[in-house]
Design a protein with these regions (language model features):
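A mobile, often basic/glycine-rich helix-loop segment
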Residues: 108-114, 118
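Short, solvent-exposed loop/turn segments at secondary-structure junctions
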Residues: 96-99, 125, 253
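Short polybasic/polar patches that bind polyanions
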Residues: 105-108, 127, 144, 267
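Short, glycine/charged-enriched secondary-structure capping and boundary segments
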Residues: 18-21, 105-109, 262, 298-300
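Acidic, Mg2+-coordinating catalytic module of metal-dependent nucleases/exonucleases
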Residues: 87-97, 101-106, 133, 137-205
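Active-site-proximal helix-loop-helix substrate-binding element of RNase H-like nuclease domains
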Residues: 42-60, 64-67, 122-160
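Conserved non-catalytic scaffold segment of RNase H-like nuclease domains
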Residues: 2-104, 116, 144, 295
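DNA strand-break repair and replication-stress modules
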Residues: 184-326
Length: 326
């Protein structure tokens, strides 16, 4: 069994176009002994568009004029196909779905038969191992964690770094790579007939389903609160808060009974509630809140757009009557 790690660099990438200029790979045996490592330079038949006008973006460690000397993707298609396909090999990439998409787009561009192979993703494997499903671990970040030297965006080096990351993960769990995939319930991705699906892990899928459910529930809670604010119209009993337009932390808005009671107290005292942070001049935060909305409120205070920020406890002591939040 051979392990094939690969990485692709493109001259440009758009929604339905990816002009491959480098196919890098590193082939090793089951003990991670390197059998071959190579950069295949490819004429992309197009210009390089990797940076914006300000020079921001990717700079490949190659002389771009050199690519014109090489054949285009069609010439290297048989070799790449032979590298990736076959029952005697396991194929890996880091954020591999992007590279698989590039292969699919290029076969369509040159009217070549689709690739057919399965692949696993070291990024997804690492997230499953560390249970860090809320953020994607980039290749460069993992090379720092595992202390691996490599040249970023040199495709063969990226493939080598991906191999070394897989080797380090196997070393930490003291098992083979197939055993590691099984241990963390990694499902292979696949490309066939110009269609492809990503590698995945059962644990990450469960996490994403739970996050989706939580997001949906938060949205429903906020919608209920929004409807209340839009429809609540009563005559103020005093002008104590006249001119004050309040907004709350999202976590307060999502606790409907509490938020409803606080809004009633604001309106009763002549104030108003703004569903948009940009429309308020006073903000109520829950203790310990470090959300984007809360941080934006503090920035607005520094800019003079918000005059008062209260913790929930402070606000309730000053203005809110204590009732059962039902």
């Amino acid at each position: 069994m051979e392990y094939v790690f690969f990485d692709i660099e493109c001259a440009c990438v758009y929604k339905n176009v990816a002009k491959i200029c480098v196919f890098g790979y590193c082939v090793c045996d089951e003990q991670f002994h390197i059998l071959k490592k190579e950069d295949i330079l490819i004429n992309p038949n197009g210009k390089f568009h990797l940076t914006d006008r300000g020079g921001e973006g990717i700079v490949l460690p190659y002389d771009y004029d050199e690519f014109k000397k090489y054949p285009d993707f069609k010439a290297f298609y048989p070799k790449i196909k032979q590298l990736l396909e076959g029952e005697d090999k396991l194929v890996f990439g880091h954020a591999a779905i992007n590279d698989v998409k590039y292969l699919c787009l290029e076969t369509r561009r040159y009217k070549l038969p689709s690739f057919t192979f399965r692949f696993a993703d070291t990024q997804i494997l690492y997230m499953a191992m560390t249970e860090t499903y809320d953020r994607q671990a980039g290749l460069e970040a993992l090379t720092q964690i595992f202390e691996i030297d490599y040249t970023p965006h040199c495709a063969a080096d990226d493939a080598y770094a991906t191999m070394r990351i897989a080797q380090e993960m196997c070393g930490r769990d003291k098992c083979t790579l197939p055993e590691l995939l099984k241990k963390y319930s990694i499902r292979f991705g696949k490309i066939e007939n110009y269609q492809f699906n990503n590698s995945s892990s059962n644990r990450r899928n469960e996490y994403l389903r739970e996050k989706s459910r939580e997001k949906r529930e938060r949205g429903e809670k906020r919608a209920r609160f929004n409807d209340f604010v839009y429809g609540y119209r009563v005559r103020p009993q005093s002008q104590e808060l006249r001119g004050k337009r309040f907004s709350f932390s999202r976590s307060i808005e999502e606790e409907f009974a509490l938020a409803k009671r606080l809004v009633k107290e604001i309106v009763k005292r002549g104030g108003k509630y703004s569903l948009k942070l940009s429309g308020c001049n006073a903000f109520v935060e829950r203790e310990g809140d470090d959300s984007v909305r809360r941080n934006a409120a503090y920035k607005m205070r520094d800019e003079g757009k918000i005059t008062d920020i209260y913790t929930l406890g402070e606000f309730e002591r000053l203005y809110a009557t204590q009732e059962n939040d039902e």
